[in-house]
C-alpha cells in the first residue's frame, strides 16, 4: 500500500478485473486521488484532532473551536484549545511545504475563526462512493488511534512511551508553528525547552553519521554524540550538557536500524533522559541516563549483535 500511496489505488491494481476497472474509474479523478492520499498519508495517526474534525465536517457546513472542543471530548480526557487551532492551521496547509501543497488537495479553508470545506472537497463529497471512501479511511484512522492511545492525555508534546514515531510526527505533536518538513533530517531537533534526540544504533556504512557511535551501556545509560557544531560552553550545546540546570527536557528516540528490507524504520520513544557525563567539543560526547530504564526485551533488541 505504501507504494500505491492509497488503499483504493492498491485495490485498483490487485482486485479481479471487474472490480479493478471500477476502482480505476474512481481513481481517474485527480482531486480525489490528491485528497485520499493526504488522508491516508497521515495513517496511523498520532493525534486524533484532525480526523475527528474532518469526520464532523464531512456532514456539516463548518466547524469552529467551540464545536471542535465538544466533539473531541468524546475521544480525549483533556482537550487542548491550542491544539484545536494548530489542527485548523494544519488542515489549512499552513505548515506544508511547496511539494506537499502540490501533492495534496486542500480540504478546508480557515478564516481564523471557523473552517469550511473547500469547493473541491465539497464537490468530491457529492459523489457517494467518494464520500464513503473518505469516511472509511477517517473512521479507520480514529479506530486505530483509540486502540493505541485510548483517551489518555500525554501532555505537550503529546508523546506516549514506547510508541513509534518519525520526525514529522514530532513537529505536529509539539504544535510546531512553522513548516513541518523543516523539522527533520537531523538527529537533533528542538522547540522551546524540548530537545528531541533521534539516535541510530546501527549506522549505514557510508552515511555522514557513521563516524558517531551511540550505544547502550546498561538499561538506563547510553552514549550520545552531539551535532558537530555544538560546544559545551554556549547555546544548545551548553543547554544539552546541563539540561536539568537549564530546565531543558531531553526526549529520546531510538531505532536499531535506519532501514530494514529497504523500508525506513521509525524511532521508539523512550521518554526523558538527563546528561550525567560529557567531554569534548564539536561534537560533545555524552552519557545520558533514562528516567525510566529499558525492560529486558527492549534492552536485548537494542544491544543484540546481528
Predicted feature locations:
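Acidic, glycine-rich low-complexity segments with interspersed aromatic residues
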Residues: 17-20, 24-28, 32-54, 58, ...
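Glutamate identity and glutamate-enriched acidic tracts
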Residues: 3, 9, 15-17, 22, ...
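Charge-dense, extended regions
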Residues: 78, 87-196, 201-203
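Generic serine detector
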Residues: 4-6, 10-12, 21, 29, ...
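Accessory helical-bundle/CTD segments and flexible terminal tails appended to RecA-like ATPase motors
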Residues: 1-110
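Serine/threonine-rich low-complexity intrinsically disordered regions
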Residues: 6, 16, 29, 64, ...
Amino acid at each position: 500500500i505504501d507504494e500505491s500511496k492509497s488503499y483504493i489505488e492498491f485495490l485498483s491494481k490487485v482486485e479481479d478485473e471487474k472490480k479493478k476497472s471500477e476502482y480505476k474509474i474512481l481513481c481517474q479523478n485527480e482531486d480525489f486521488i490528491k485528497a485520499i492520499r493526504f488522508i491516508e498519508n497521515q495513517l496511523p495517526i498520532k493525534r486524533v484532532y484532525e480526523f475527528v474534525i474532518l469526520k464532523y465536517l464531512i456532514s456539516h457546513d463548518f466547524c469552529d473551536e467551540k464545536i471542535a472542543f465538544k466533539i473531541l471530548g468524546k475521544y480525549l480526557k483533556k482537550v487542548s484549545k491550542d491544539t484545536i487551532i494548530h489542527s485548523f492551521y494544519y488542515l489549512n496547509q499552513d505548515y506544508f511545504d511547496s511539494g506537499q501543497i502540490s501533492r495534496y488537495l486542500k480540504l478546508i479553508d480557515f478564516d481564523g475563526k471557523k473552517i469550511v470545506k473547500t469547493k473541491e472537497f465539497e464537490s468530491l463529497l457529492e459523489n457517494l462512493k467518494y464520500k464513503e471512501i473518505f469516511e472509511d479511511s477517517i473512521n479507520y484512522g480514529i479506530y486505530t488511534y483509540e486502540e493505541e492511545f485510548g483517551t489518555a492525555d500525554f501532555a505537550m508534546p503529546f508523546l506516549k512511551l514506547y510508541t513509534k514515531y518519525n520526525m514529522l510526527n514530532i513537529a505536529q505533536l509539539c504544535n510546531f508553528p512553522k513548516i513541518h518538513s523543516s523539522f527533520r533530517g537531523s538527529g537533533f531537533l528542538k522547540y522551546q525547552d524540548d530537545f528531541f534526540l533521534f539516535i541510530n544504533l546501527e549506522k549505514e556504512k557510508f552515511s555522514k553519521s557513521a563516524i558517531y557511535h551511540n550505544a547502550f551501556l546498561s538499561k538506563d545509560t547510553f552514549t550520545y554524540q552531539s551535532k558537530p557544531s555544538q560546544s559545551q560552553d554556549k547555546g544548545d550545546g551548553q543547554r544539552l550538557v546541563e539540561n536539568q540546570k537549564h530546565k531543558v527536557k531531553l526526549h529520546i528516540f531510538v531505532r536499531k536500524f535506519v532501514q530494514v528490507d529497504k523500508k525506513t524504520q521509525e524511532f521508539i520513544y523512550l521518554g526523558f533522559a538527563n546528561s550525567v557525563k560529557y567531554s569534548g567539543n564539536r561534537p560533545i560526547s555524552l552519557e545520558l541516563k533514562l528516567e525510566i530504564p529499558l525492560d529486558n526485551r527492549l534492552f536485548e533488541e537494542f544491544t543484540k549483535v546481528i
